Amino acid sequence: MINYTIYENKDSNQWVTFVHGAGGSSSIWFKQIRDFQKEYNVLLLDLRGHGASQTKLKKAFKQKYTFSALANDILEVLDHLKIEKSHFVGISLGTILIRQLAEMYPERVQSMIMGGAILKMNFRSQILMVVGNTFKYVLPYLILYRFFAFVIMPNKN
């Protein structure tokens, strides 16, 4: 099961689940926790291969790394915590997974807030995802980040 952190609000039965982007971790949401916890129970996730959910290189190649597999990782945590329905907040890759989850299990998604939403991945994006997932074990994060920024960001015209 992927790593998760809970911030409880004893006066609420509603949940907000935060899903980070590629290369990130649940720590990106630290500024949002206090305000959301005033009204909701907060669930932070570290996606497979990120943050405290990182796997060993040898094991990483044996796992299926698809959007539906990652969405099922999220569902596994919700089931484990007996969360029937949640609001979701996501950024970048997180938006893809929230959408995937909403398509697979619409009854589990109360609402979606999607920042920097990615609506579909073209072939180039899919290749970059595989390359990034493979090389993150052997290259420093900053080098990978700069490479992807160079490839993804638009050129000056």
PLM feature segments, named:
Residues R34, L43-V89:
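Active-site loop/oxyanion-hole signature of alpha/beta-hydrolase fold enzymes
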Residues F123-S125, Y141-N157:
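Conserved alpha/beta-hydrolase catalytic His-Asp/Glu region
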